[in-house]
Amino acid sequence: MEVIVEGKVKTVYQGDDAQQVIIEYHDKVTAGNGEMVDHPLGKGSLCCSISSIIFEKLAKEHIPTHYINMVGANKMICKKVDIVPLEVICRNRAAGSIVRETTLAEGTPLPHPIVEFFLKDDSKHDPLLTPDRVRLMGYDPDPFIEMTLRINDYLRQMFYIMGIDLVDFKVEYGYDAHGDLYLADEISPDSMRLWKIGSDERFDKDLFRNDEGDIVPAYREILDRLQPLAIQ
């Protein structure tokens, strides 16, 4: 298969259909712009399965996603889109960079969900962008904000039912050949912070990032909690 993009933890191939791609999830985890690397067995299939369930749930809420279906344990067929070079972060609690860069303590509930933009460029260390800078890049930030908040509303309720607090998450978007906007990339514990309600237990990549434990059992726990919801 023709490789379109070789990412840190995923490879994107051209599909048989010119308007489709195949995304392969690898048993690999990175942090610190690739400075930390590990290869946890089974991690790729877990992220692929979790993403597929979440994409399907969001599609039922009329949120357009690039996802079509899974093929095998760690691959999915997706609609081909041109990825926007932005990482869009939605925050419900203070964690990560917002703690490092403000006076907020980790875990502080935010008065309302905050949507932030970061340039998708490792060489520049993914700098924070203002909405005006997003506009200067040629993109209207409002559709990204609106869709991200819709995603947050749904996922926050879904994870609450699972006993999980959705602290924050990252999404990426792309435009198809007709100029329509789609949620793309993935939504998995690699791109979310998930804390067990009422405890300090975590189910996300911070376990690896902060050397606090094995991510595979944590990701498997998220998949186990998601699967009963997948059939609803």
Regions found by a protein language model. Name each.
Residues 27-30, 123-124, 189:
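Short connector loops/turns at beta-strand edges and beta->alpha or beta->beta junctions
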Residues 68-74, 161-175:
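A short glycine-rich, hydrophobically flanked beta-strand micro-motif that places a catalytic Asp/Glu
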Residues 90, 166-185:
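Conserved metal-phosphate-binding beta-hairpin within the catalytic cores
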Residues 108, 187-232:
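C-terminal helix-cap and adjacent tail motif
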Residues 136-167:
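A long amphipathic alpha-helix within ATP-dependent nucleotide-binding catalytic cores
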Residues 35-45, 122-147:
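Short histidine-centered catalytic/ligand-binding loop motif
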Residues 25-26, 92, 182-189:
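Short beta-strand elements
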Residues 1-119, 226, 230:
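Active-site loop/lid in soluble adenylation, ligation, and acyl-transfer enzymes
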